Amino acid sequence: MRLRWNSNRRKFLGGLGVLASSMAMPWKLFGSSPENKSEATPSGFGASGNPYEELGVTTVINAEGTMTMLGGSLIRPEVEAVMALAARHFVSIPALEEAAGKRVAQMLKLPEGYGALVTSGAACAIQSGLAGILTGDNETLIQQLPDLTGMKSEVIIQKSHRNPFDHQLRGTGAKLVVIETRDQLRAAVSERTAMMHFSNFANEAGQIKVDEWVKLAKEYKIPCFNDAAADTPPVSHLWDYANMGYDLVAFSGGKAMRGPQCAGLLIGRQDLVHYALLNNSPYEDTLGRGQKVGKEEILGMIKALELYLNEDHDALAQEWQNRLDLISRAVTRVPGVSTSFFTPDIANHVPHMRIMWDSRVTLTPQQVSQMLRNSTPSIVMGGGEGKPGLAMNSFMLQPGEDQIIADQLSRILREHKA
């Protein structure tokens, strides 16, 4: 395949030579040379240590979880350090993506023939993955998207799996064929079917579960995608679905793994992962050009994954529960207030707590939520998802923030007794 956007072959191959030589002197790629060892000290903007405050933007205590609207998660210091090293050098992005994908596949012990791609997030992984299935490595088709003339054009999805993120599927130009039953799925399969899409968080809502969905896809020889963006923990999900036979799986890098917010992983068959890259930045005239992932995010994602795989996940879960217990003990001292605990089966599979109260407290959950947001420091806590009271989790809280929430929430509830 001849790629017009790779037409300057001499420069590209020269860049690979630089990359190879730099691996013999790793400080050139990842380390510090004597002249750049010192950390830059901000002057002007950022000199206060709180650039958000300088802009008049309020930082918040996040009791809602890894919400993109709140910035996802906080990048680990070790990840920041690797990203800072990455920022000091130029590198061939396609070569870096290939090397990073191999490293990720090794770390996750993916099945033979599987690879990985660092994307700008799980949503990008969804769109790029489908785009690659539609076009393969055909340059004309890649540049043609979202015009699907001459390509397969339909994606089968369960009705209960429809969600705002299937916009990424529709963005390729594909038509969603919505089904509910096994018989409807079999009837929907045609020569136009490009992919079968599964939203992992909706596993319990649909009639066809995660394991049967991929078996049906294999039966019809249709590529099968699983959107598992928020589905770590448990950590095993990072390889479970590939081992189950899914051709492509998407994960967010900026949630529980605490990698760069603008990073994600597309895991799957090596050919499809390669086609996804061809439909993405750094290549021009592609659907995914605007979903650029930088060298800093690529290397930061590898470091975040390394740290995540080596964590004591049981100890972390206990720490999260301890934080909720502290808050529960404080708020239940207020007459009429009670708490209960739950852990979602999939998606944000971490300890959660629901906080409820009876008529002895005169506020609605919405009023309490707004008061917490308006407090100092500002606290963001979610609603009860259509259920009474407030719901929260603690896995994005920083040390000491559980006590702040306990104090603020107890005060608000106590001050508004009937």
Predicted regions and their residues:
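Metallocofactor- and cofactor-centric catalytic cores in central/energy metabolism, strongly enriched
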Residues: M69, L74, E80-A81, R88-V91, ...
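Conserved C-terminal alpha-helix-loop-beta "cap" of PLP-dependent enzymes
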Residues: P51, V331-I412
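A general structural detector for well-ordered alpha-helical segments in enzyme core domains, enriched
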Residues: K209-W213, I327, V368
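Generic N-terminal amphipathic, Lys/Arg-enriched alpha-helix
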Residues: T59-M69, E80-A87, H352
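N-terminal export signals
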Residues: R2-W5, R9-S33
